Amino acid sequence: HVDHGKTTLTAAITKVMSLKGAAQFMAYDQIDNAPEERARGITIAIRHVEYQTDKRHYAHVDCPGHADYIKNMITGAAQMDGAILVVSAPDGPMPQTREHILLARQVQVPAIVVFLNKVDMMDDPELLELVELELRELLSKYGFPGDEIPIVRGTARNALESPSKDINAPEYKCILELMNAVDEYIPTPQRAVDQPFLMPIEDVFGIKGRGTVVTGRIERGKVKVGDTVEIVGMTNDAPRRTVVTGVEMFQKTLDEGIAGDNVGCLLRGIERTDVERGQVLCAPGSIKPHKKFEAQVYVLKKEEGGRHTPFFSGYRPQFYIRTTDVTGAIGLPAGMEMVMPGDNVVMTIELIVPVAIEEGLRFAIREGGRTVGAGVVTKILD
């Protein structure tokens, strides 16, 4: 929630970790004056900091404004493997706290650790217990394991303002406890390269005498010559299976391509007309084509280059999914008349053609090539 101390905590973490030589200290105003970035056509003020514990290296993001947080979570500008929920003890959970927990659930943040801030302002230990209880209930209500989530108590400002260079100074204890909780409780994510193969197809070429080559950047997993793969999406037909007979990168032949590589894959028995941009090449059965899904969507304000007017159920924009635009119709929840620019809503979307989709997939909503919103798939409906 605004003023609960997210930015103070971020600065305090970099300070304490810098005493261990495991981070570069970043002052409050450096974080607060966050640079703007673009993600899926949306501008977001976002500050990245990094630090190292004994166990892991962390990339941590902080956003100055509430709207920036929402945009960051929905666009997935920063991939989140976990989150620190900062709550001011004297204030307790506030409406934005609920919204953040709900969004974290919707966009599939795997784990949350809580930092209960400003506890020095609480004289009554029973009140502190109540705030903690309320938080655990709130987390459970939105599908997180409220009973087992670590809640670390402390005062970020005291850690930030302390003159001490001794990492064992009492005012730093809460920050070290928090880092320990993050290390122990937030699971290590599976690396992209260890997940099933998937490459969004960006381009298709016919090569005389050799067959059809599809190019793109491998999103996850790996591919090697001889692998059986599927071509999924952009058609009502079942996915086609084929065999990769060559993998190339910058005109060089490779044994295999891995997540992050830009490659060309030569496909056996596939005509130039059988494949198109917007389809994906993937490990068989690893992703299915769908038309209908539920999504959490942020609609751009007019000042952000979005629409100037609301839209209603039945609105048919383009959905930019991975590499291409697909037309679809929007359905609003019961009782919701319309969506205003700047709103953050759950909606159902039905595309005119099935596309390779899974929960957690990010997309942009466009109108005549201009981004008017961003969303994340929260539930497949067909």
From Swiss-Prot:
Molecular-function annotations in GO: GTP binding; GTPase activity; translation elongation factor activity
Binding site for Mg(2+): 7
Enzyme Commission (EC) number: 3.6.5.3
Start and end residues of each tr-type G domain: 1-190
Annotated GTP binding sites: 1-7, 62-66, 117-120
Coiled coil: none
Record key words, sorted: Cytoplasm, Elongation factor, GTP-binding, Hydrolase, Magnesium, Metal-binding, Nucleotide-binding, Protein biosynthesis
Keyword Nucleotide-binding: yes
Statement: the UniProt record of this protein carries the keyword Transmembrane: no
Catalytic function, reaction form: GTP + H2O = GDP + phosphate + H(+)
Subunit field text: Monomer.
UniProt record similarity statement: Belongs to the TRAFAC class translation factor GTPase superfamily. Classic translation factor GTPase family. EF-Tu/EF-1A subfamily.
HAMAP family according to UniProt: EF_Tu_B
Cited function: GTP hydrolase that promotes the GTP-dependent binding of aminoacyl-tRNA to the A-site of ribosomes during protein biosynthesis.
Protein name: Elongation factor Tu
Gene this chain is encoded by: tuf
